[in-house]
From Swiss-Prot:
It is found in: Secreted. It comes from the Eukaryota. The record marks 27 as: Basic residue of the functional dyad. This is Potassium channel toxin alpha-KTx 1.4. The keyword Secreted applies. GO terms for cellular component: extracellular region. Expressed by the venom gland. Blocks selectively the high conductance calcium-activated (maxi-K) potassium channels. InterPro entries: Scorpion_toxin-like_sf (IPR036574), Scorpion_toxinS_K_inh (IPR001947). The keyword Secreted applies. It comes from Centruroides limbatus.
Length: 37
């Protein structure tokens, strides 16, 4: 799932992903965070 968090590196997504989907597995794709669920 993409969340509305801009990023330049994947580690910037880990905390927002943890908050959004309950897991810190995420990647930065196209300047946006993608969380896996």
């Amino acid at each position: 799932v993409f969340i509305d968090v801009s990023c330049s590196v994947s580690k910037e997504c880990w905390a927002p992903c943890k908050a959004a989907v309950g897991t810190d597995r995420g990647k930065c794709m196209g300047k946006k965070c993608r969380c896996y669920x």
